[in-house]
Amino acid sequence: GLVGTLRRKLVTTTNESERLEAGYALARLALDNQPGAHPDQWAGILTFDSPEALVPLDEDETGKVWIYPSAVDAFIKCPLHWFMQAHGGTDKSFEANFGTLLHKVLEEAKTNTYEELWKGVESKWHTLEFEASWDEKREIRKAKKMVENLVGYLDDRAEKNYRLVGTEVLIDFDLGRAHIRGRVDRVEQGPDGQVMIVDLKTYASGKADENSQLGLYQLAFMEHQFDELIEQPATLEGASLLLVGGKKFSTNAQTSLTENEELQKSMRAIIDDAIIGMSAQEALFQANVGTHCTDPNGYGNCSILLTPAVSYAG
């Protein structure tokens, strides 16, 4: 429309007289209350509502930044995307929604058979939304494969004499200026007392070495969050991603922080950086533009933020 054309000319023309004409025209339209004409309605040019940090980080550490383990990697990858998710934005991909469903089914299942787990999935399938019947049929095939892979993993752990000591375990503790709170998918203990913390993912692949979520779970062990569940003496074997989205299940483990001092220092440094960033000490959240911005099946869909303030189709 006219407003869009004038706004585009205002920011693109190099001719000073044309810029002035566009500015005057927009001013007249703004006086007439035409939508989008007034600068107050232009995205990206308003000042901060407040320059204050979300959480004041006092020297006595009374100000605590609440951190959820599952959110730290998201913050590292793109602070702006994390901020949107933390304040109402959600990931609507099938993998994310089915992952939530599968976690609940696994928590409630009395046995680890395929029949039992798939029955649980079917009982909750109606909570998922699909755009078309063919889309639903495709996702059913994917879901069945994920359940099959999950059963394969559970059978493998049983053969290795690992037992489940906790599922959806609440962790809630202070770590410096951070208050850590979340739930751990699985806590398993091996025949020699070794404890493995497991995070179930519906992806086909994932890196574990510097995964901050796994690192925080290990720090939770070191802060005695699982003492009531595990048998003593116990050692921390590490934390692992359980990936069920591929042709077969796979695991990717992070080495024990109790045995890798360098990795432990790295994880604590990541948390310190997240504390400063999540509390908005610098009053901004950086947008790290990348492929995740426009991939609805990947990290998230932020394509709306990539749309220029003034667009024109002529």
Residue locations for each model-derived region?
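RecB-family 4Fe-4S metal-dependent nuclease core
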Residues: 1-314
